[in-house]
Amino acid sequence: LREAPALARCLYLMKGRRDARYNELISLARESSVRFQTMEEIWFRRRAPDIAHQGVLLECHSRTLADEKDLKDKWSEFGNEPLILILDEITDPRNLGACLRTANAAGVDAVIMPKRNSAPLSPVVLKTAQGGAEDLFLVQVTNLARTIAWLQGQGVWVLGADGEGGTVWDTMDSKGPTALVMGSEGKGLRRL
């Protein structure tokens, strides 16, 4: 509701809940002109049986992910020192959500993922991201190697993350355009 109110369709709140957070959500919905409804507990159990919803659900419009062309069109908006995160074959939705949450906190300008062999942008991903995905520029590409080559052609320094490495990302000198590539949960970085 705060980060991307245009994506919100309807806020559902459980009947009987009255607390400061509940009132804050109603205020946010009103400020953003998002419709809201109160529903019985049974509605929540049927609508979201596998989600710990805490009596609150937000129905959103589908989010369209950018592609290679969109990345190239938006490139100049990132300024002189863009920070790009490239996620190669992150298949676990919770891991993807955690990566997006961290990327948002780190000030990443764009997150690039392959179209195949990656977790889709699901409710689990978005919940794990805790709002961190809402204002990130998310890009899905057909060919990660080609996209990396294009980034290098734009002067981007491409680094690969290593679980056994000794340098922590926030202590390295990353002046200038930088892209950090993170590999899959099980195999790490693949040869691109």
Question: For each predicted feature, which ranges?
Answer:
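Short, glycine/polar-rich helix-capping loops at beta-to-alpha or helix-loop-helix junctions
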Residues: 21, 118-124, 188-192
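N-terminal positively charged helical leader segments and presequences
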Residues: 1-73
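Amphipathic alpha-helical repeat scaffolds
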Residues: 1, 91-98, 143
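Histidine/lysine/aspartate-rich catalytic loop segments that bind and position anionic ligands
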Residues: 109-167
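Short, glycine-rich nucleotide/cofactor-binding loops
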Residues: 84-94, 113-114
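Active-site/ligand-binding-proximal alpha/beta "capping" segment
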Residues: 159-192
